[in-house]
Amino acid sequence: MTPTLLPVPEPDLPRVLPVILAGGSGTRLWPLSRECHPKQLIELISNESPLSATARRLNGISNASLGDTLLLVCGEQHRVMSAAQVVGRAAAPRILLEPAARNTAPALTLAALDTTALDEDPVLAVMPADHIISDVAAFQDAIGRAARYAQEGAIVTLGVLPRRAETGYGYIQVGAQRTGRLGGQGGYSIGRFVEKPDVALAERYLHSGDYWWNSGIFVTRASVWLKAIRALAPAIHAACEAAWRAGVAEESFFRVDAAAFDACPSDSIDYAVMERLTDHPELGIEGIVVPLAAGWSDIGTWDAIWEIMPKDDQGNVARGPIVFEDTQDSFVRSEGRLVACVGMKDVVVIETADAVLVANKHDVQRVKNIVERLKIDRRPQASEHRKVQRPWGHYDSIDLGERFQVKRIVVEPGKQLSLQMHYHRAEHWIVVSGTAKVTRGDETFLLSENESTYIAVGEVHRLENPGKIPLEIIEVQSGNYLGEDDIVRFDDQYGRAVVQTLPPKPATARAAREPRDEAAERETVR
């Protein structure tokens, strides 16, 4: 089925508010994508992350009047990194923070509640943060066409004409072409949504021409979505409304209430609403699919990334220091170490500092099973990289033993860590470069290069960078438990949870634990 598109008339342009859903974890792209640093924040294809590219391509949507705000829905732990990647890329962002992942239907419901409270019911262009679009003009044109139908009360999804028999995508059965005033704008009724098919069924869909890939991009008026979700998934609507009403604004962030949101069921836009619209004609809401011919790809797996990247004459994709010998149709990426492949075909090799994936290219959908096993075994590689981004900078876990850990910590100029303490570990800090401002108990002092200090178990402390260049320190932790959840925060400028009262002064206990020569050394260093 080849759609015929006519120019969209100019009067009465819909006003479109872009909504980016950035709550995914990207487990099938492990070990590069991890829970604390998911795929939408990683430079997977180029020197730009998918989230940054998504925000940038929203500038100048054709056939619609773009509002002056971009709405981003993301997880609490990704808020600072996500905000940094959209600032300056598109309109000014307003960021809704989900305390827990609940799939796309609750995320869109929160966005619709937020916009109707602050606006006059705009048309929402809702899209995931992890798609690749090669033809931005065609994408913007499709959004503008879909917005025309949405303005009149439909919920519109963008469908992609399949290029191959893909088993990793959902499909939409395309119904009759829309007629009437907007009949020439490429819209079709939706027959049904189909889950990811097996290979034989995907081949049938490809050759029939009546089944398009489900892009996961939706266009709807905020009020229309709220009407649909209230009728078809009332528990989602009720929980999201309660969570939004009890939420707290903090500069460009809006933090929904965690306790209320905890009661929200997890469901997708497709399952909660789109698949059920035809069974509820009393709602008066039509589901429409508009074609998207813009070089769309959902980069959810390593084979999907291999598919769209430039290849050598043997069909190989290399990123990083890679050597191929008698190897074909493979994807190899190294974050540092040299990787050599000999006599291989259809393999994926991903090297990181603390984990290496080697997989058959046709089995990469099963990478998520590895991540689940790592979580069961409580391995840190399931959720964090060795190098971990924080609002104040980053740290790199250089070495880890049974009762010790060595970290390289970099604090950006003007940034500070939270005022905190640990119940199970002591810390030694050595300044490599820059100047450190240290709070330790009742003391505050500066440390310069080659100077050091000691933080005892249970001692309240803070590290700051008051200078103009990055502060780099080596931290040596020792204790019987070294997990990142052994942090009690008393003050934090990044909105992380804090306790309200400081503990009793630990001076006496510290003196009992600390050798006299270490105390003397600390006085000398200060």
Indicate where each model-derived feature is located.
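A secondary-structure boundary/capping signal
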Residues: 21, 127-129, 221, 292, ...
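Conserved N-terminal catalytic core of the sugar/cofactor nucleotidyltransferase
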Residues: 2-21, 27-140, 144, 160
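Conserved core of the sugar-phosphate nucleotidyltransferase
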Residues: 135-263, 281
